[in-house]
């Protein structure tokens, strides 16, 4: 919406709050007088997406541009590192290098994993998060997380996978996590969440393998004074069956 002061100076409704309802030209108080002529001019404009330098080729009418940019699939991603609010943003190749070089996150090529988590004094860990590994699988990147937190008053551990890309593309993949010992095991299968979702949002939705602390310590064996968990898993791509139209798994070795 385009507004103007009593002297005819114009500015947009977004900027009105930034100038504290005062015209930046004449300092008169701004009302809600719309400049319809300028709005008509704005409606006729077609502008490219501001993320064109990242690959977006779309062109939009002026008033649709901001709405598109808020959801543009080429918009930069926030750093997915868990455990700190890292302010870095960028495309996927940049963030993979950033995670490796600045956060010292391990990177591996392959779609299967086998991790062992060892923590002394696990009863003292109420809120902790670890981004353990970034996997390069099927030409895409995935982040494996492991967290300790409370559900109500119950201490739990949780493992989950995030996809370094958009939500729609994440739906093409599935993953499994498994933990166990002494002839018992827990399993989880699901779809990785996009890194568009903050890791806390994923954690708080309980979208992953959740292990109660007493079960985790049972799996650890011994005197239950040390956490020793082995978590294995794999990632696969759901492919369309050309004959029956049914999704069949394509498992990367």
Please provide the spans of the model-predicted regions.
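Signature of small Cys/His-rich zinc-finger-like modules used by ubiquitin/SUMO E3 ligases
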Residues: 1-253
């Amino acid at each position: 919406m385009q507004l103007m002061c009593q002297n005819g100076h114009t500015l947009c409704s977004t900027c009105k709050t930034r100038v504290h309802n005062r015209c930046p030209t004449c300092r008169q108080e701004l009302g809600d007088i719309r400049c319809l002529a300028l709005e008509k001019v704005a409606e006729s404009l077609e502008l490219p997406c501001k993320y064109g330098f990242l690959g977006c080729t779309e062109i939009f009418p002026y008033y649709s541009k901001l709405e598109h940019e808020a959801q543009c699939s080429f918009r930069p991603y926030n750093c997915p590192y868990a455990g700190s609010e890292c302010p870095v943003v960028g495309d996927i190749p940049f963030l993979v290098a950033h995670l490796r070089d600045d956060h010292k996150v391990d990177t591996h090529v392959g779609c299967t994993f086998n991790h062992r988590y060892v923590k002394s004094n696990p009863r003292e860990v109420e809120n902790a998060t670890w981004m353990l590994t970034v996997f390069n699988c099927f030409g895409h990147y995935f982040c494996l997380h492991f967290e300790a937190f409370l559900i109500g008053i119950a201490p739990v551990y949780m493992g989950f996978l995030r996809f370094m890309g958009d939500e729609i593309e994440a739906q093409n993949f599935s993953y499994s996590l498994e933990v166990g010992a002494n002839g018992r095991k827990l399993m989880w299968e699901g779809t990785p969440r996009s890194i568009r979702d903050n890791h806390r949002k994923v954690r708080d939705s309980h979208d992953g393998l959740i292990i109660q602390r007493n079960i985790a310590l049972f799996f650890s064996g011994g005197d239950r004074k040390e956490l020793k968990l082995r978590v294995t898993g794999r990632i696969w791509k759901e492919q369309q069956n050309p004959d029956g139209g049914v999704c069949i798994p394509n498992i990367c070795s």
